[in-house]
Amino acid sequence: MPKITVDGQEIEFKQGQTVIEAARENGIDIPHFCWHPSLSVSGNCRVCLVEIEKMPKLAIACSTFAADGMVVHTKSEKTLQARNAVMEFLLINHPLDCPICDEAGECKLQEYAFKHGYGESRFDEMKNRKDKRVALGPRIMFDGERCISCSRCIRFSDEIAKQNQLTFVQRGDRVTIKTFPGEEFDNPYTLNTVDICPVGALTSRDFRFKARVWDMSSTKTICPGCARGCNIDMWVRNNEIMRLTPRENPEVNDYWMCDWGRLNTFKFVNAENRIDGAIIKENGELKNVSIEEGINTAAKELKKYKGNEIAFIGSAFATCEDNYAFAQFAKEQFSANNIDFARYINEDDQDDILIRADKTPNSWGAENTGIKPGKGGLDFKEIIEEIKKQNIKALVVMEDNIAAIDSEIEAALKKLELLIVLAVNENETTKLAHIVLPASAYAEKNGTFVNFEGRIQRIRPAVVTEEMERSLEGMSMSRLDKFGTKYDAWANGKRVNAKPSWQIISMLSQKLGGKLNYQMAEDVFDEIVKTNKEFKGLDYDVIGEQGVQLESFKKVTETV
């Protein structure tokens, strides 16, 4: 392979790579604002200037192609002087907003000013004044004074979101960003511009002024908003999810995620209507009880039913581990064949970027861990029909609000003698239930999802329930988590009394004299691997942070 030398280090590069790409691939950081690996090159910030031997002047690393034998200096006196000058130029009119800016702590301008700036200003003149609180759209606030005109947001809108909604207006130090006349910055991916903005010019109207980055823990997990399974970081402060941001995975979502997934897939975890402990219905009235009492009551009632009198509804919102335990419980404990899950497909809400029509994260995983009718068993629609006829008298539903699908299903559920629901939040289905058992949300447990392309990916706990301890669970910890005391106000975040569905099922099985006895999510997954050839050779370490494509999907991909 061809080679270049960067700061005395000889590195290999691929033909067609620029200097900044070759350096980055080999762990060498060249400062940059406007360059982004998934966007076109604009070359307008000039902070990536480097000295290249045998070239008459400094070159920008983002648009200069690497050539065999090239010698590059990123820290020479000439380079550092130019970089310092560029930083000084950018800071002339930049406001001192760091104490109130959402970007503080993850701001490239802040970082580079410390590393590459002069440390003081030579300018006494009044800074330029621009509009500071401009609502570009329903989700984005723009601060013109902070903008350094890198054009990342414009290029993202044009090239990734495929909607030309932003542009530069005016010239020189008066330049600013606006939407085109009559347009609003409202495409389904606008909040990605907040992530790629190197300063605090673009902020999320949902997250604005809510938390400092150093006060939050960050956990690598998966967005459950659709079958794409975007890789995300979940940011938590005081045991409350504050925001979600996309995490790079070239095989799934690149650097992006949709606005709907970012804003609507975590707030239910923090909601006031969380199921906190078990609920049983006695004489028509709801009664809060411990999880153990709820399980004892459920086991006692379930003993009255068997075979075709009972049905089980799993969930494409639940993990592979939850669904496997649920299916094993139904089949081994009750010899039940009436088992299925509801599908949520919206063909009108899909694009060729990220958003999928399947609005669940684990349809394939649910079906292939046992949530499907057994021999002679009924599918979801048939189960509902048999409930209407009162041939099915008992139903167990896991992590799905099936009563909200339509009024006919809601009416059918009212005819049941026994409805047991494992749920995260109060909903239309829990209101009809005779017993409600509190299930942990996806943000409170370990597990796996399989996306529409057959990539199995891990979710990890970012929020603790009553029985969990952040340090003992090996969870991500913020500065507050590490050094706070029980007397600090922010150290007393709300914890709900809930358990993962696989654990509730295991406890139910034990009460009924069954064989299920799982202690950890990994125990369930190991059993899936042993019994299902689709998962052969996998474990949590193999899946890692980027996920693994299952063998059967690899073969399909290779054939295509």
Residue ranges and their predicted role:
Residues 1-16, 24, 36, 51-55, ...:
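N-terminal export/assembly segments and adjacent metallocofactor-ligating motifs
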Residues 19-53:
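A basic, amphipathic helix-loop patch mediating RNA/tRNA/ribosome contacts
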Residues 22, 50, 156, 257, ...:
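Hydrophobic/aromatic ligand-binding patch that stacks against planar heteroaromatic rings
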Residues 34-39, 128, 521-528:
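Short linear loop/turn motifs
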Residues 62-67:
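Structured interaction patches on ligand/partner-binding surfaces of diverse proteins
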Residues 305, 322-323, 329, 333-534:
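Non-catalytic alpha/beta scaffold blocks inside enzyme catalytic domains
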Residues 521-560:
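Long, low-complexity segments enriched in small/aliphatic residues
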